[in-house]
């Protein structure tokens, strides 16, 4: 109550202001403006006592509120300033509420906002904030007016008004919570309409206001709000994400019905644990610890045994990561069955950022669930199959980390029972990517311990070496994941891998056979070296020596079905080439396999591939097939069973290519072997001189050349007389290389004319030969003239001393 002196002072001031009050009704806005400024000077700007100001405020309030509707913006502005000054200074501002609140509601809370000036709307909202601050609970009777105002101003076009409105929402909720919950829900619609505003600070304010509304409401609208808050976790502004984290954390700590919403709120807070901003991560960690501790205290009776006998962290617990508290872990475990379906749905969302956030959340959930993951393993594997095939690198990386956690927390026997059938037949799982189960297997193996995997190594090795797995696809991604699985087993189990050395080698050979990229083949070869190191072997040769018999038997089991499309032919090549000298130790097993594959009735393209491999081996025979010096024992078999049957002429381009390849092998044999089948061989080579292929004719000439060198003076007269006419034909060949090689072969042919060659009876042959050779002395190609003809003639003279033939031939017209 004002004292008598304060009342007199107020009355005196009011008398002095009577003229100014009358001027407020003037038509001239300047006069009204001056009157308001005079009121301001004589009241709120004077150092009057609180009681006197209270009396003045009561006397001037209606006039000032009327000025809020003044046509002049400057007058309305001054009136608001005077009102604000009185509210801040008077001891009982609540006395003004019966008139002030309806006036504000009329100005701001109607269907149409009457105040056109955005700065004045902001000033009015600041006045309302001040009223909430100084009046508090005494505003309860005016809640409806405030709700009307806020419903309109939250969606105001002016961002500053939006922010001030959100501030008022929080103040109302905290000032009169007992009444606010009755009307709180009516504010959610305008708030959610504004939560995606372009200004980040507006989004922050709306998020905070939404948190207050839900906190002090009946809690029925949490579901309506969650999706909007979840979207704000992807906000580009760290301040917005921080606000969401604080709001959700506060709900988990204080929301009256929070237990009903744990499964919906926990994912939002845990998502912030993976935020890119350290401050937000730290904030989320602190809130999560508080939530876990509070829940632990609230449920002490249920957790008594676990609290009294706390189990240590799993042995393979992620290094550098603090283990969550018991309360946090239990909260996740008890809600995991409700969380995983949503995770499985969102991991396939069309938005990349949603998939990344979900993948990060999955890892955090598994870190909390620990061995409780086991009961959800099937659904977890399904989620991981999809996620590990995601085109986004971040999604795949997070899911691989999740798979490693499964390896650390789940028994190997359990996850292998579910996972290996999917590896053998990827169509049995829901993934469209054949490499997805392999990807998950590789990551889980990486997360497992050596002791856990050791009893199951044979099962793992057999699965990886199964034809449907190691030969299941030529896709680069599939082969990469096969290598990842092999490397994971080698890395974790090390020397224990000796029991599945053969299976792993089969996988690595298969990868090299299917790989279309040299980089993949190099990786596979590196894995072979790692396999050797794991067993203490000196190199790949030792590894192949250990398993060559089994590898050849592995290939022999299916060789009758090989075609040009069979991977086995390439596997054979890799084994033979990479084993080096070891292949020479297993000729009894290798050559029958080659014989079967090179039968003329088999696929021509497949035979061509085998001949190409054989040619490479023969060219380096001392370090491959003949490394033990025993290849000569099998030479006749090689010629009779492998080469000669394939030199027989057959129609078709494929058959011609096979004959060319066989000639290439024959030439390699002739370069380093002694033969006992020269008669048969020379017949086949003579036939090959007529091939359509230039390369085949060239190889045939070279082979005859080598054969003549190897069988010097051992060929009978008939064989020699059959050879030279065919060589003479090749001197007229369209290919210069073939002509040159034919002349070289003829030169060697002369050296084969030993004592058994009857020059008298064969005189017509010699005369014909010399006559034909002399024709080439005038060949337009000087290389042909100069190359071998003089040498041939001289050899005839020196070796056989039949000068009369030379002289007669030279003088024959």
PLM-predicted stretches and their roles:
Residues 1-813:
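Extended, low-complexity, acidic/polar intrinsically disordered regions
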């Amino acid at each position: 109550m004002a004292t008598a002196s304060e009342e007199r002072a107020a009355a005196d001031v009011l008398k002095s202001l009577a003229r100014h009050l009358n001027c407020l009704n003037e038509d001239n806005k300047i006069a009204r403006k001056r009157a308001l400024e005079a009121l301001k000077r004589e009241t709120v700007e004077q150092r009057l006592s609180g009681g006197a100001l209270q009396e003045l405020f009561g006397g001037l309030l209606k006039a000032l509120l009327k000025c809020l509707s003044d046509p002049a913006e400057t007058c309305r502005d001054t009136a608001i300033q005077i009102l604000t000054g009185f509210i801040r200074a008077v001891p009982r501002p609540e006395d003004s509420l019966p008139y002030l609140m309806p006036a504000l509601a009329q100005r701001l809370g109607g269907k149409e906002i009457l105040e056109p000036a955005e700065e004045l709307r902001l000033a009015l909202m600041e006045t309302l904030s001040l009223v909430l601050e100084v009046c508090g609970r005494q505003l309860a009777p005016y809640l409806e007016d405030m709700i009307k105002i806020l419903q309109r101003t939250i969606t105001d076009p002016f961002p500053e008004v939006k922010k001030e409105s959100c501030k008022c929402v929080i103040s109302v909720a905290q000032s009169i919570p007992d009444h606010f919950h009755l009307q709180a829900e009516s504010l959610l619609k305008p708030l959610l309409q504004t939560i995606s505003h372009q200004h980040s600070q507006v989004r922050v304010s709306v998020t905070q206001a939404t948190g207050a509304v839900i906190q002090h409401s009946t809690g029925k609208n949490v579901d309506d709000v969650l999706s909007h808050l979840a979207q704000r976790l992807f906000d580009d502004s760290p301040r917005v994400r921080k606000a969401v984290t604080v709001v959700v954390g506060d709900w988990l700590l204080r929301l009256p019905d929070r237990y009903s919403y744990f499964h919906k709120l926990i994912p939002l807070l845990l998502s912030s644990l993976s935020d890119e901003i350290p401050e937000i991560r730290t904030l989320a960690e602190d809130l999560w610890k508080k939530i876990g501790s509070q829940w632990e205290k609230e449920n002490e009776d249920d957790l008594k045994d676990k609290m009294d006998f706390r189990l240590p962290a799993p042995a393979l617990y992620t290094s550098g990561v603090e283990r969550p508290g018991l309360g946090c872990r239990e909260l996740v475990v008890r809600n995991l069955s409700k969380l995983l379906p949503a995770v499985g749905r969102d991991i396939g969302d069309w938005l990349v950022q949603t998939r990344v956030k979900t993948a990060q959340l999955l890892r955090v959930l598994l870190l909390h669930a620990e061995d409780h993951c086991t009961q959800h393993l099937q659904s977890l594997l399904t989620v991981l199959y999809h996620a590990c095939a995601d085109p986004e690198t971040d999604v795949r990386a997070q899911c691989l980390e999740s798979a490693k956690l499964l390896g650390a927390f789940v028994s190997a026997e359990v996850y292998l029972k579910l996972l290996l059938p999917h590896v053998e037949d990827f169509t049995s799982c829901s993934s469209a990517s054949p490499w997805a189960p392999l990807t998950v297997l590789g990551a889980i193996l990486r997360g497992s311990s050596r002791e856990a995997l050791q009893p199951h190594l044979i099962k793992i090795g057999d699965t990886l070496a199964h034809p449907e797995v190691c030969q299941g696809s030529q896709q680069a991604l599939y082969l990469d994941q096969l290598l990842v699985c092999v490397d994971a087993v080698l890395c974790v189990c090390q020397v224990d891998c000796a029991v599945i050395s053969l299976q792993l080698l089969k996988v690595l050979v298969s990868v090299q056979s299917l790989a279309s990229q040299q980089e993949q083949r190099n990786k596979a070869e590196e894995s072979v070296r790692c396999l050797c190191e794991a067993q203490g072997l000196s190199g790949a040769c030792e590894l192949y020596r250990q398993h060559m018999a089994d590898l050849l038997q592995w290939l022999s089991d299916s060789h009758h079905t090989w075609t040009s499309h069979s991977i086995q032919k390439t596997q054979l090549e890799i084994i033979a080439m990479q084993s080096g000298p070891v292949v020479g130790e297993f000729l009894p097993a290798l050559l029958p396999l080659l014989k079967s594959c090179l039968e003329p009735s088999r696929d021509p393209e497949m035979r061509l591939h085998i001949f190409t491999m054989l040619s490479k081996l023969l060219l380096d025979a001392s370090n491959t097939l003949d490394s033990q010096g025993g290849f000569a024992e099998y030479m006749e078999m090689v010629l009779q069973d492998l080469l000669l049957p394939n030199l027989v002429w057959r129609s078709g381009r494929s058959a011609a290519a096979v004959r060319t390849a066989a000639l290439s092998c024959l030439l390699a044999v002739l370069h380093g072997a002694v033969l006992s089948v020269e008669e048969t061989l020379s017949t086949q080579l003579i036939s090959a001189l007529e091939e359509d292929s230039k390369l085949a004719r060239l190889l045939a000439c070279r082979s005859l050349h080598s054969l003549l060198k190897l069988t010097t003076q051992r060929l009978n007269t008939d064989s020699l007389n059959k050879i030279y006419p065919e060589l003479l034909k090749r001197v007229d060949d369209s290919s210069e290389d073939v002509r040159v090689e034919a002349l070289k072969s003829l030169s060697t042919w002369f050296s084969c004319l030993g004592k058994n060659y009857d020059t008298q009876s064969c005189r017509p042959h010699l005369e014909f030969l010399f006559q034909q050779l002399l024709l080439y002395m005038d060949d337009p190609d000087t290389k042909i003239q100069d190359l071998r003809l003089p040498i041939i003639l001289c050899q005839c003279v020196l070796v056989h001393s039949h000068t009369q033939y030379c002289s007669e031939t030279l003088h024959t017209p």
